[in-house]
Amino acid sequence: MRTEIQTGKKVFPRTVSFLLALLMLLGAMSTVGCGKEQVEEPSTVTDAPEETDNYQKDNLPDTLNYEGREFCTLYWNGAPFVEFEPEENATNALSQSVYERNDNVENRLNVVLTWRGIDGDNSHQTKFITYLESTIGSNLHEYDLVASYSMCAGAMAMRGYSVDLMSTDYFDYEQPWWPNELTSQAVVNNKLYFASGDISTNLLWNMYAVFYNKDLMEKLGITDNMATLVKNYQWDWDTMLSLSKDVYVDLDTIPGKSLGDQFGFGIYRVYADALFYGSGFRTVETDSATGELILSPTFGSGDVQSLIVEMLDYFETDDAWYDNGEGWSTKDYFVNDQFLFDLRPLYYAPQVIFAQDTKKEVNFGVLPVPMYYSDQGKYYTSVGFPYSIYSLPIDAKDISCSSAVLECLASEGYRKTTPVVFEQTMKLRYSEDDVVSAMFDVIRENLTFDLGRLFCSSFNKGAYSNATYYLFRTVAIAGNNPNWISIYKGEEGAMADVLDDIYTKLK
């Protein structure tokens, strides 16, 4: 029996056109210490962003003046794209825009922004949290703001290291630079301990989408107008399966399926979460009557069971390639016309556009993650984990100042960095037509967040760590286990206990 899935509010209520793809940008590498980070510059210079005076302004008082005080942000090393502090003479548009964002904040508030980067990506989460314990936990007043890998923010809040943003002077959650659904999903007892949005360039790059190869589609004689399918809410799971059927060709003559062959669809195992959220499912909700956190009725539902069974059956056919880590390439298979559809984060777009290390130009389009049911009536875009979430440390020297800088960074990012990532880069430079750009708008406008994902590192009381994503992604899909109801029931009690802990500690 299908369960009713509630649809959330549309995210990012602004008219920013959606664009991607900067010229071979590399993640910023930095050294520990509140100084300037070193950014490896691309070989090609892109134009600086145009003025964006038509964008909404914040409500920060013009009279704010912190008299040139140093404001130090602790951030995680390893962010895929530049976000924190580029060099002043950076030659690419994104680095320039981040520099201008920071410069505007310094001039508006009369602060001197300094930065300290430490290891803190997926493989260094424990190291990052341990360092927080030695500084914030010891009340040393070293940092005014923390920008953490997304999985760390919930752990930071659970340890009592984060300030309730709603209680601060200048955080304005109703502004367009804070995604509606992120702020609403992360609120517990009317308190919000972290936020992200236009303040994090890496959030924008890590949205999931489906790339499709137009040349291969034409070669196969597929005449469906993909934009029309999306517009008419006909881009669903069944449609994708139908279009990808009988695309398989044994190109390398190796017996059985192999990465050298041609497929209708390809996906890497860590991206499977996108199909869960694209179907409108959640792991955690807020009880409308009590305000308490509960496991979403959709999480353990028969609908998820059905999706898993269909995914596993599909991945067993020659139509699809599910990669469990055997040798997944960043771009080669799609670039070489071996996949008709390829589900990836959007940071894949520059690699496809430039066909790095190849001489081949790729004629491609992008689509939102397909709906599960045709009558779902809404697309849902989830985000990969490598983006930043910002928190105010409990021992910040001046909470009001930290609140002002946080709001100003996000506000200036909305006007400076986001237009570069979206407008000055992909749409005006690389999109071949308005249809491609419109698809990016659909992807961004339907961003979805889930408290169970935001606090995933806390869900470790049962048999599995990070249970809110691990059960679906790894136990069911990677483990080729279709018995979802049994899997869920085995962890349900432990996950409910974690929600009680979160609710108690954050109220």
Sequence positions of predicted segments:
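Short, polar/charged alpha-helical segment
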Residues: 84-110, 215
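Gram-positive cell-envelope targeting signals
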Residues: 1-56, 72-73, 105, 142-144, ...
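Immediate post-signal peptide segment of exported/extracytoplasmic ligand-binding proteins
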Residues: 51-88, 106-107, 250, 254-261
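Glycine-centered hinge/linker elements that transmit conformational signals in sensory
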Residues: 241-244, 283-325
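Extracytoplasmic/periplasmic substrate-recognition and gating elements
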Residues: 356-428
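Extracytoplasmic/periplasmic solute-binding protein
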Residues: 74-77, 140-146, 150, 188-210, ...
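Extracytoplasmic "Venus flytrap"/periplasmic binding protein-like
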Residues: 108-189, 358
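Conserved C-terminal helix/tail region of periplasmic/extracytoplasmic solute-binding proteins
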Residues: 391-403, 413-507
